[in-house]
Every structure is written in C-alpha cells, then in structure tokens.
Amino acid sequence: MSSDRATIISPTQLIICVALFIGLFNNYSFFSQVWAIYPPSGDNLLFVGSLFCVLLLFTALLISVFAVGPLLKPALIATLLVSANTGYFMDTYHIVIDDVMLDNMLRTDRAEAFDLLSASQALYFIALGVLPSVAVAFAPVWRTPYLKAARARLGFLCACLFSITALLLLQGSSYASFFREHKSVRFYANPSYAFYSVGRLGAGLFDRATRPYLQIGLDANRAASSTRRKIVVMVVGETLRADHLGINGYERQTSPRLWQSDAISFNNAWSCGTSTAVSVPCMFSFLNHENYDQAEALATDNALDVIQRTGVSVTWLENNSDSKGVALRVPSLDFKHAETNSACDSECRDVGMIDGLAAILEETTEGDLLVVLHQMGNHEPSYYKRYTQEFERFAPTCQTNQLESCSREEIVNAYDNAVLYTDHFLGETIEWLNQLDN
C-alpha cells in the first residue's frame, strides 16, 4: 500500500473517530450522572466502560443512518456542532435539551439569544465543535462505488447493532437495573437525546399545524352589572420564585410595596412547567396541570379569547420574548424597543408598559377592559441586568451571565434585587389603578 493511500481513511473510520470524540469530550454531563450512581470500583468500572462502548456504538449507528454519500461530511460536521452546543448548555446550566427546550430556542428573540452568549461558550464551541469540524472537512476519505459503499455501510450498521446487543446481554442485570431505576440519565446522552428531541419537536409542530382549531365557551356572557366600567390589569411574571417574595415570608423584604398595598398572595398555585413556552399557554388554557397538552392548548380557545368574545376589550402588552401563542387573536403591543417603551436604558424596563396602560385607557373609553402585562421580570441568566442601579440593595452581586463563575451569594443577591424591581413595577401598576379609583 502506498504512503498516500495509507493516509486516506474510510467513511466508516471517520464516523468512528467523530463518535469517539463526542463520547470522550461532549458527554461530561452524562458521565457525571453515571459516576454519581456508580462510584469508581471494580464492578462499576466494568459496567461504566461497557456503557461508554454502548454510547459510542449508538452514536456511530445514529450518524451512519444520515451520513451517506455526499452527506457524509455535512452530517458529521452538523453532529459535532450540535453536540458541542448541547454539551455546553448541559455542562454549564445543568439542563437537558428536550423538545420543550428546543421549542423555547425556536421562540427565543435576538435579545434573549445575545443574553446567553459568553466568552466561555465561544471557547467551548470552537474547541469542541469548530476545530473538529475543520478536521472533518479536510480529512481525505476513500471514494468507493455506490453499491460497494452501501454494502459496507449496511455491514457496519449490523456490526453496531450486534455489538450493542452483545454488550447489553453480557451485563443484562446491570443494564436492566440501570434502565429501570435511572431513566433520567438518558436525557444527558449527547447527541442522541438531542436528536430524539428534534424528532419529538417536529412531530409536535406537525400535530399543531394539522390539528383543527376548536372554539369553546361560545355561550359565555357577562352578567348585568353597574354602569361603572371595570378595568383589570393582569401581570404575567418571569422566573420569580414564590419563596423569594417577602410577602410570602422570605427572610429578606423583597416586596415592600406589595406588603404596603395589603396584597393577597395565593400561595397554593403551581406552574405547568419551568419554561415560558409551557407555563404561559397552560396558564391561560382551560386544561389543568394533570392533563395539559401543548398542541391541544394552542389549537383551542384560551381564556383571553373567551373573555374578548363576551365584549371585554382585551390587550396584551409584551416586554418579554412573545406570548407563546396566547395573544394571537387579541390586540398586542410590543414594548421591547425604545420606540414604544419610554423606560429603556441598557434594556427596556417593565415600568414602561404603564404608559401603555394610559394610552389604551384613552383609546378605549367605553366598556370593560382587560390588559395583560408580560414582564421581563427575573429572566435568567443575566439577573444583574433586570434592575436599575437604585434597586441594588443586596450586594455583592453576580455581574455576568456565566453563573458558574459566581458564588451562590452573588447569584441570590442579584436575583433578589431583580425581585425588588418587580415589586417596584407592581407597586407602580397598583398606584396607577388607584388613581383611576380616585
């Protein structure tokens, strides 16, 4: 064999190299979970080694299905870039990349996306995504006739399946226990679970697009009332924990204005999820926590639709990313830009929406009125950006979006300062409403 021939690798070898690289460098979160369950010892080392081989073979199997012919290098590069990005967010924020998280990413606006960027992310992405992708792009690969390449790929797929099966059977009891008792660990397998989540998201989006829209509450009406119009303001918050509100007994008084206003706190309320894409549509849907289905909720009238149909003027004011489908059929105003929000500095503040309330009141002179304010609130991870300087009551604070570089005290202080600002916003809203009463 010539020296030139010896430096050229086969498509199968390139796939194995990429799968090995991902297994070694982009699965820190996965193996952190595994080592927490199986501390290093004789039998555990054997099982974890077997698990690594299964992960490697399954990744190679998954890549082999798509990395065929002219798609070989593009598919490998895409896999490397996806696994690097997935690995960064799992390693840094200790999250899993499921279909809900991907849905959030699709709905993320530019400001939110830039809020997540950091030097550490860039370095991580370059080292574990871009550089190996460049190596793949310039790797010399054998060119073989189509039928011969197809036979080789089929043989490799069969070899992967056989090897995975053999490994599972050799330690059957260990794998049975692992899959039965530690199901959540699979969420950290990179990139296989991310690819699975893409499939689930695609199926969910197709379901939403093809599901017929259902109107409900067509017989809803308002009972006769006094001639005095009713004006209701509803605030949809963002990432505000109930146990960090002074009004709920938190050790710090983070809600002095709510306390002074004699506000009532309904503390037996629960969100359907921890992401905006789930919690906001659920909040306004007629489904409950137990039977909530995203596709059904978005294809059915929500509370705003029914209220509007009864003759109430409904308006949605937006200072977050968007309404996640809730306000598609009611008037909405965007307050994320200085052109519409009078309280913008480094970012547009929630209090700017109060001017919007006054404008809506001037335009809607008759009938009952419901205005929903969707605030930026404590949107993570840049808590220090969510309040102005005069509300930095608790110090020192975390002054970066790289929360892993801050102490818990600094993160909590920045978070609580943002809660204070939300309390200020709510206090200003209540004061505006009180002026209407007067």
Predicted regions and their residues:
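Catalytic cores of PAPS-dependent sulfotransferases
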Residues: 65-74, 78, 93, 306, ...
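Membrane-interface anchor segments at the N-terminal boundary of transmembrane helices
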Residues: 41-48, 346, 411-415, 419
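Active-site-proximal alpha/beta segments of enzymes that process anionic O-linked groups
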Residues: 168-235, 239-399
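Transmembrane and membrane-interface helices of multi-pass
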Residues: 1-188
